[in-house]
From Swiss-Prot:
Keywords: Repeat, WD repeat. SMART domains: WD40. The gene is SQT1. This is Ribosome assembly protein SQT1. The lineage of its organism: Eukaryota, Fungi, Dikarya, Ascomycota, Saccharomycotina. GO terms for molecular function: unfolded protein binding. GO terms for cellular component: cytoplasm; cytosol. May be involved in the late step of 60S ribosomal subunit assembly or modification in the cytoplasm.
Amino acid sequence: MEPQEEFITTEEVEQEIVPTVEVEQDVPVDIEGENDDDDEMMNDDEEALEVDMSNNSLTYFDKHTDSVFAIGHHPNLPLVCTGGGDNLAHLWTSHSQPPKFAGTLTGYGESVISCSFTSEGGFLVTADMSGKVLVHMGQKGGAQWKLASQMQEVEEIVWLKTHPTIARTFAFGATDGSVWCYQINEQDGSLEQLMSGFVHQQDCSMGEFINTDKGENTLELVTCSLDSTIVAWNCFTGQQLFKITQAEIKGLEAPWISLSLAPETLTKGNSGVVACGSNNGLLAVINCNNGGAILHLSTVIELKPEQDELDASIESISWSSKFSLMAIGLVCGEILLYDTSAWRVRHKFVLEDSVTKLMFDNDDLFASCINGKVYQFNARTGQEKFVCVGHNMGVLDFILLHPVANTGTEQKRKVITAGDEGVSLVFEVPN
């Protein structure tokens, strides 16, 4: 049965929330800090960045000299990796205040757009916009990271992800539409190519591993492209599991740019349901374990005449593992919160500028924005709970850290950002 085309109108939205601009407790922060001998955060001759606005961050890392595009965190150690427009990746600690600088990774030919540790924590995989992939091996318990291997198979990499459960495994997509999957040798860090796929005719814009709960004998990936195709792959054989084209989506043009895997708690144990969003506002929900059956297809926004076409672009998608909720974030600043049991919009949040990333965590929805803020909402009520402020340019990425168990001290969650002005800020989430 064909899915019904649905247009979300303002009448269908139960509640619209416009976040407040001010934060209750604005704490000014001295960004210059003190030059501590063992801090290694800033050289005396470096010019400090002046942030002329309120700032409620705990601390900061500012060694990048250009935009910070990517941020990743080690699965076990308090270690952050950030990648920037300065063609560098930096390692630094997430538990100390201020952060302790732990090393710089060099050898990139362009901006570093992905920093990802492997699931077991033994390797760090980074990628840049010149098509380079560098693999660093952790030594001395993760205190040192040594270059183990590198490759350059494509002109430009768009995305790279490590597998969440299979050790030493990663995949990436390129601007020529190609898809690649590799496994890292545990002993020496050398690379074994598992597959390469050449089905997409335009940029392979995003990828997501699926069926990650099935053990190490199942290695499957779904990718999407600006050419309106969505493809699922068996990464061990390189075979296509299915391919969705414009014909399967009513002939609509859908330059896909975002992908998100639904948690099994929402899908009765099916770990192959994904949502895919396009840069013209089309949303598709697909069952990858049923030949790519389309469960839902809709246009999420009706643009006003004065709006730009890209205002409808779905930049980020996130599913709640606790409630029947899914959120999508648009370039126009709207966040639509869907009730996944009925595919109706339960809430609409309106931010001041483009949404860059969404993340559910327990009862909360976190959203980063080009206005330089990260918002914390109560996912069920839509109530704004906290706003991270301190950037004077956009937040391009962020991670959320949970307190380490059994430390004996009461700790709070932390938001760590990747800022367009070259700074990462560390925030403590008060509740």
